[in-house]
Amino acid sequence: MSKSKNNVINPLDLVEEFDPEVIKYYLLAKISINNDGVFSNELLKNTYNSELANTIGNLISRTIAMIKKNFDQPVKFVQTDDKNDLLAIASIVKNTKEFQLHFDEFAIDQAFDRMINLAKSLNKYIDLTTPWLLTNNLDRLEIILNILLNGIYAIATMLEIIMPQKVQIIKEVLNLNELNFDLIFDFRKFDEIVVNEMMPLFLRK
């Protein structure tokens, strides 16, 4: 990117198309502070659609929609020995710890790679457990949706570092005033919370 090649990006034009928090996400999550990075409108758009809209946004939208459709009371944590449940719980714990480790070492891009990895694993968990087919088995559905809620909490806690305004919307949906890394590992935190309806968080571009 240089003036001589006439490929300089005007930041004022950029913020007309993208939320400033989205731009900040790309700069911190996709570019290493230790190496040169590549930036273009196309890469920014692809990252936004792939990671924020498709991976994180769809995860939250699907989970909240299934909760609001099937429950009017808190979705509580229940002990489980199901393999897919245990793998999802392990993914929440593992990716959170690795996020914290990378962040403490200033490997910000690697930290947020763990966040996206967690979101992808939870989307896979949805595909494997097919909760939309469990409307006649609410006990099983509750287990799955609580695990997903806990995963969303972890993702929101990580994402708040870069996108506090967007995460404020998530907190309102989750009916929470604040997020805390220590609470990620407490899977009973939603036992007395009724979540709220939500609108799409990240609209595709």
Language-model-derived ranges and their functions:
Residues 1-86, 177-196, 200:
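Catalytic adenosine-cofactor/nucleotide-binding cores of aminoacyl-tRNA synthetases and other
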Residues 3, 14-15, 44-55, 84-91, ...:
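Secondary-structure capping and boundary motifs in well-ordered enzyme cores
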Residues 8, 41, 93-97, 152:
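Residue-level signal for cytosolic alpha-helical hairpin/rod architecture
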Residues 13-16, 25, 46, 65, ...:
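Charged/polar, solvent-exposed surface patches and flexible loops
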